[in-house]
């Protein structure tokens, strides 16, 4: 798979596939003719190896709960070490079904009701609701844009921390500004 090339330019219609990005435009924006630039939902085909693995699994007639193989954790550890020189212990890896549920879990785990959680806008909108729906206090630490370059306002971040923040929900790489 390492030498395989993918066509990132092919136009593939997703209309009629229950795609929130395309089929949901009328519900979300009140019209269908808007460009869906609001969500990080890719418009290129999945790699053939991924499609083949999903088909092979789907051919088994029972869809029960999955117990990830232990090798998955080693793969995650190796990837983090190779790409980021980050050594992560096996017990520090928690698999989740998606980022939004993880944001809610983090707000619940690291701050109590009414306690502060810092979010750095502009950011993917579920960061805000993860805090407010968890009955935590939303503390905003807006990023600063200078000549098209976004950065953290560390002085303001310190003030947020001094206001009793118990957690910071960090988006990295940052969506939508792209900083790591």
Q: Locations of the language-model features?
A:
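Conserved core of the PLP fold type I
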Residues: 63-180
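N-terminal small-domain helix-loop-helix segment of the aminotransferase-like
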Residues: 2-98, 105
């Amino acid at each position: 798979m390492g030498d395989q090339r993918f066509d990132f330019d092919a136009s593939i219609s997703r209309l009629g596939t229950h795609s929130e990005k395309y089929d949901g435009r009328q519900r979300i924006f009140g019209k269908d003719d808007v460009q869906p630039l609001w969500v990080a939902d890719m418009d290129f085909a999945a790699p053939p190896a991924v499609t083949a693995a999903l088909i092979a699994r789907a051919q088994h007639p029972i869809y029960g709960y999955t117990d990830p193989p232990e090798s998955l954790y080693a793969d995650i550890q190796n990837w983090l070490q190779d790409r980021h020189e980050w050594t992560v212990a096996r017990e520090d890896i928690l698999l989740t079904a998606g980022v939004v549920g993880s944001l809610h879990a983090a707000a619940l785990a690291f701050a109590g009701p009414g306690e502060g959680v810092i979010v750095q806008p502009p950011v993917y909108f579920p960061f805000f609701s993860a805090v407010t729906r968890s009955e935590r206090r939303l503390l905003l630490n807006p990023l600063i844009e200078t000549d098209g370059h976004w950065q953290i306002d560390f002085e303001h971040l310190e003030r947020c921390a001094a206001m009793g923040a118990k957690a910071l929900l960090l988006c990295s790489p940052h969506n939508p500004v792209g900083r790591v």
